[in-house]
C-alpha cells in the first residue's frame, strides 16, 4: 500500500447539533414550565372551579374566589424559578461566547484565539 492511499481527515464537527439540541431542550422546558396548571383543585368529582366561581344545588354549595393572577404562572414555585434562572443564565453565558467570538489581536501582534 502506498502512503497516499491513507489520508487523515478532520473529525466531523458536531457542535451545531449540540447547539440545536440544547436550544430545543431549553424551549421545551420553558414551554412546559409556563403552560402547566398548578392551580389547586377546587370542587368535587363533577364540579371543578379552578378559576373561582360559585355552584349551588339542593344539597351543597360551593363558593370559591379566584386565586390571584400571579399563582397562574408556575414560575412562582421556588423549584421552577430556580430551574428557570439556571437555564436562562446558562443560555446567556453560552450565547455570549458565540457573540463575542472575534479575532482578538494582542498588543504583541499575534492572534491568540483558541480556534
From Swiss-Prot:
Transmembrane segments: 14-34, 75-95
Top-level lineage group: Viruses
Keyword Transport attached: yes
GO cellular component: host cell endoplasmic reticulum membrane; membrane
Further remark: TGBp1, TGBp2 and TGBp3 seem to act together for cell-to-cell propagation. TGBp1 is the main movement protein that physically cross the plasmodesma with the viral genome. TGBp2 and TGBp3 would facilitate TGBp1 function.
Subcellular location as annotated: Host endoplasmic reticulum membrane
GO biological process, one term: transport of virus in host, cell to cell
Record topology, Cytoplasmic segments: 1-13, 96-115
Keywords carried by this UniProt record: Host endoplasmic reticulum, Host membrane, Membrane, Transmembrane, Transmembrane helix, Transport, Viral movement protein
Family: Belongs to the Tymovirales TGBp2 protein family.
Cross-referenced InterPro entries: Plant_vir_prot
One Pfam family hit: Plant_vir_prot
Side of membrane Lumenal, spans: 35-74
Keyword presence, rRNA processing: no
Protein name according to UniProt: Movement protein TGB2
Function in brief: Plays a role in viral cell-to-cell propagation, by facilitating genome transport to neighboring plant cells through plasmosdesmata,.
Amino acid at each position: 500500500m502506498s502512503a497516499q492511499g491513507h489520508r487523515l481527515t478532520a473529525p466531523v464537527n458536531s457542535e451545531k447539533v449540540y447547539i440545536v439540541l440544547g436550544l430545543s431542550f431549553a424551549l421545551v422546558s420553558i414551554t412546559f414550565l409556563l403552560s402547566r396548571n398548578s392551580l389547586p383543585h377546587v370542587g368535587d368529582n363533577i364540579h371543578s372551579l379552578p378559576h373561582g366561581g360559585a355552584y349551588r344545588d339542593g344539597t351543597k354549595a360551593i363558593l370559591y374566589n379566584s386565586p390571584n393572577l400571579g399563582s397562574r404562572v408556575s414560575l412562582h414555585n421556588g423549584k421552577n424559578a430556580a430551574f428557570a434562572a439556571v437555564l436562562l443564565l446558562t443560555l446567556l453565558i453560552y450565547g455570549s461566547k458565540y457573540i463575542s467570538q472575534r479575532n482578538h489581536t494582542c498588543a504583541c501582534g499575534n492572534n491568540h484565539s483558541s480556534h
